[in-house]
Structures are given as structure tokens and as C-alpha cells.
Amino acid sequence: MTLYEELQARGLVAQITDNEIIDLINNGKATFYIGFDCTADSLTAGHFMALTLMKRLQMAGNKPIALIGGGTTMIGDPSGRTDMRKMLTKEDIAHNAACFKKQMEKFIDFSDDKALMLNIADWLLNLNYVELLRDVGACFSVNNMLRAKCYEQRMERGLSFLEFNYMIMQSYDFYYMFQHYGCNMQFGGDDQWSNMLGGTELIRRKLGKDAYAMTITLLTDSQGKKMGKTAGNAVWLDPNKTSPFEFYQYWRNVGDADVMKCIRMLTFLPLEQIDEMSTWKDQRLNEAKEILAYELTSMVHGKEEAEKAQAAARALFGGAAMDTEHMPSTQLTEADLTDGSIGILTLMVKAGLAASNGEARRLVVQGGVLADGEKIAAPTVSFTAEQLKKGVVIKKGKKVYHKVTL
């Protein structure tokens, strides 16, 4: 099976500009890039598709370029949004880019020029605006740009000129890397198709040469919602933002209808094994979820952390003695207490188990909160410093455990 056939079998290919892409990636002749807007100081589970694709392509001899959006992050990509993204400072972007590289190195081999990490800001921030308008802007039709899918949702609410430039700037990135780094291919999410076509067309018009683009399938659940968030919050690759246990549990709790799709698209398990697993039903789906969670946690946090997370999850949910050592936890200080105690509602908010006192109150009233195995009887319950020094295990719903200490 060729690389392209495997990508298709895993359901990763959405669209390609030309069939020449197939020969290029199969023969390890592609120098390709994927862009990352560094709007936070950590990658998320939503970046998994891009990271694993880069790894697959590199393993076949192709050269990845991880392009950090140091310039375009200052604008904000309007694709798939109805609001304007927050713009970041140069200092924010530099910090976020450094965090990204550390996480990407778990997927991509940057040694011996096998891969590159570039920052758009290195060329984009030094552009002369008049020259850009003359040399690049002249190659774009405003009529065609306004028909692009990435601008549709923003037109009714108002599309700023700042955001309107995003397609031109992303196209220029491809054009620049084609000239200076031999980058002949771009990969991205299916929502980036219009922007990617802009880059291939700019290269054709300015240089008379061919460049290629392929979009990858967005990772969505059976309801069509993007995966990578839990309770509205991102699932981070940074263990300080999302612990290895929480990361493991996110994938362990995917829906029955989604587990095999995730295994096929995100893991490196052989397709023959995945095809056999696709016949599993009922309780064996839980086994498949454990495999998914272990594989992805191991990829991000290492095998040791994956094994700890798996053992903790089995202890918590399998009826064995509770493993509190690897449980998500929050350590309070004396300053968090009032007159030597803290109420359950405040405690839940500080532990990230509820977004507000109101939400915490509803959970308690509905009987969905336990402390050390005992149901919280009323929202007025509080915990003393002595109790907290021993550690209090809060259970929210059926699957969320959190240890709070002082």
C-alpha cells in the first residue's frame, strides 16, 4: 500500500489540487508546510490531525515545514468564524511559538535538516506595503476573494480590511517558501481550501511553476462537531493545562460511534488491526477506547505517563482501590479560606469543576457532587483546613474525579 492509499484508507484526504501530489508524496519528493496560528501557548487535541499527518509524511521521506503564524496571528484568520479573533503582541507570539516547538518535537524529527520550523514574521513583518500591493495584490481578484467560503460567514456581520488581507498574506507565505525553501506543497484543514488555492495560483502567475495543495478531513464527532474540547474547554497538549490523566480520559470517553474513526485517523496502529477492531461491539468498544486513549497519551506524554493514566482510570472506574496519586488535583492556600474553611461552591470553581457558583449550585442541588464518596447534601456544605490537609476527593457526575488539598 502506498502512502497516499494509506491516507485515503484512514479517511484523511479531503481535496487535492492535482494528481501529481500522489507521486510526490509516495516518492518522498514533497517539501510541504502546515501553518499554525499561535493564538495560545500550547497546541491542542484539535492539532492532532496536522501533527500526525506531518509525522506520517516525514516517515515516508517527505520534508515537513511547521510554519508558525507570527505574522498572520497578528491579523486573525476569519475562516469558520463569525467574530474577529483577538490580536496578539510580538512578545505573546514569540512565547507561544517557543512552546509550540517543544511540543511538535514529540511528533517531528527536526535533526539534520529533516524538518524546519519557520516563523512567518521573519519575512512578513518586513514587507513594504506598496511593493506588496503592486507585486502581489495585482494577482488577486477582489470579486473572486469575496466569493471565497472563508469570508462568507463574516460578510453579514462585517469583514474588516485587516482580515480581508489574510488570504493574500497566507498566499504570500507559500510563494516565499516556494522560492527560498523549495516548498512545493501545502496541507491544511478543509476550511482553508480557498486560502490554499490563492497560494498555488500566486506561484503560477508570478513564477510560472506548479505548486500543490491538499486539505485533510476535519476531526468531527458523529454529530458533526469539532473534537478536541471538553465542557467547552480545549484539551491541551501541555500537561500543566490538561493533565495526562485528563487527556487520557478525554479520549477514553469518546462516543461509541466515534472511537474507531479516531483510531483510524489519529493512531499509527496497522490498518489490518484497525479493520479487525472495527467488528468489535458492546463491551469490546470500551477496550477500543482504552487503546485509543493509551496510544494518543503515549504519543503526547510518553509511555510512562500513559501507563499511569490508564492505571488510575482503571482504579477509579473499575472498582479497585482509588488511585489518588495520578488524579487531577488542586492545591489551595490559606488565602483561599474564609475563617478557616471554604464552601463547596467556591471550592468547585477554584478546582475548575464549575465555571461559576451558580453552575456549582445546580450540580449540587441535582445530586451530582460527592466528597470522599458521600453525596453533598446542600450547597452550604464547607470544608475545614484540617479536612483539606488530608485531601478531599470531589466526584462530579459519573466520571470526573478531582483531589483538593491544602
Where on the chain are the PLM-derived regions?
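Divalent-metal (Mg2+/Mn2+/Ca2+)-assisted nucleotide/phosphate chemistry catalytic cores
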Residues: 10, 89-90, 96-215, 221
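Positively charged, low-complexity intrinsically disordered leader regions
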Residues: 1-32
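A charged helix-plus-loop insertion that forms the helical arch/lid used to bind
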Residues: 78-94
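Buried hydrophobic packing segments
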Residues: 50-57, 177, 195-203, 296, ...
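N-terminal catalytic cores of NTP/NDP-binding nucleotidyl/phosphoryl-transfer enzymes
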Residues: 21-78, 186-193
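Conserved nucleotide- and phosphate/pyrophosphate-binding catalytic cores
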Residues: 203-406
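Short acidic, glycine/serine/threonine-rich loops at helix termini
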Residues: 76-80, 127-133, 225-231
